C-alpha cells in the first residue's frame, strides 16, 4: 500500500503491558524514487515522526494494540498519518539491536518481561540520536572492493558497518532491498550529531558492482 500513498514514511515502536501503551519512539524513513520502494535511510525520532506521534499512537489504541512489542508504519499525508502496517513484533533488519544499544533499558529483556507478566513502570521512551544508511547498488555487475564489516567506538558515538555483499559475487539488480551492499548504523545515546560519523564511514566505503563487458 505504501507505494500508492503520497507522503513520507514513519514508524512507531510501542510497548504495552495490557493496561498502557507507550510510544518509545520511531524512525523517519527515506525511500528511493518511484516507481520502486526501497528504504535508503532512517533517522530515529525524526521531525515527521515526532510531529505526528500522538496521532499515530491514537490510531494504534483505536485498533486495539495494547500488549507486547509492536512495530507499525504510517504514511504522513496532507490529511495526517495513515496506518498502513501493524506488526506484533519488534522492528527488525538490525534496528532491534540499534534500539538495544540506544535505550537506557534492555530492549529484549523488557519485551520478554512483558510476556512474564511484568508491568511497564518508569520511562520507556528511547532518546538519543541514531541513523541507519543503506548503501544501494546502482546497477548489476561483479562486486569489487575491500570494505568489511566493523564496529567502531568514538566516545559516545558507535558506528557499525555490516557488509551484505562479497567481492567477486555476481550481482543482479532487482530494485529491492536485495540491492543493498551494506548497512551503516550510527548511534549516540547522548544525542550527538551523527553527520560527520556518517560521512567518515561513506568516504571510506569501497564496495561496488563493476559493469561486465560483453565478449
Q: Language-model features: where?
A:
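Structured beta->alpha junctions
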Residues: 3-5, 88, 100, 190
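Short Pro/Gly-enriched coil loops immediately N-terminal to beta-strands
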Residues: 6, 104, 177-179
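Beta-strand-dense domains in secreted/periplasmic systems and polymorphic toxin scaffolds
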Residues: 26, 84-86
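A short, polar/proline- and glycine-enriched secondary-structure boundary/capping micro-motif
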Residues: 33-37, 93-98, 206-207
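Active-site "cap" helix and flanking loop/linker of ATP-utilizing ligase/carboxylase catalytic domains
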Residues: 50-72, 78, 87-141
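A short, glycine/Asx- and small/polar-enriched loop/turn
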Residues: 76-82, 175-180
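Peripheral (often C-terminal) accessory segments that flank ATP-dependent C-N-forming ligase machineries
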Residues: 110-215
Amino acid at each position: 500500500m505504501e507505494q500508492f500513498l503520497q507522503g513520507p514514511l514513519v514508524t512507531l515502536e510501542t510497548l504495552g503491558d495490557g493496561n498502557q501503551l507507550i510510544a518509545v519512539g520511531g524512525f523517519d524513513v527515506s525511500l528511493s524514487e518511484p516507481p520502486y520502494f526501497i528504504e535508503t535511510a532512517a533517522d530515529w525520532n525524526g521531525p515527521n515522526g515526532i510531529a505526528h506521534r500522538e496521532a499515530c499512537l491514537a490510531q494504534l489504541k483505536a485498533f486495539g494494540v495494547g500488549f507486547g512489542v509492536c512495530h507499525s508504519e504510517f504514511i504522513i499525508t496532507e490529511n495526517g498519518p495513515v496506518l498502513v502496517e501493524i506488526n506484533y513484533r519488534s522492528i527488525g533488519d538490525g534496528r532491534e539491536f540499534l534500539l538495544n544499544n540506544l535505550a537506557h533499558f534492555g530492549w529484549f529483556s523488557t519485551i520478554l518481561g512483558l510476556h512474564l507478566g511484568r508491568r511497564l513502570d518508569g520511562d520507556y521512551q528511547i532518546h538519543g540520536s541514531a541513523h541507519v544508511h543503506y548503501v544501494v547498488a546502482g546497477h548489476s555487475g561483479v562486486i569489487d572492493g575491500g570494505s568489511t564489516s566493523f564496529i567502531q567506538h568514538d566516545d559516545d558515538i558507535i558506528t557499525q558497518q555490516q557488509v551484505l555483499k562479497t567481492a567477486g559475487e555476481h550481482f543482479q539488480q532487482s530494485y529491492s532491498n536485495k540491492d543493498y551492499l551494506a548497512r551503516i548504523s550510527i548511534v549516540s545515546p547522548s544525542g550527538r550529531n551523527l553527520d560527520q560519523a556518517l560521512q567518515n564511514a561513506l568516504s571510506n566505503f569501497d564496495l561496488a558492482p563493476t559493469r561486465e563487458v560483453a565478449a
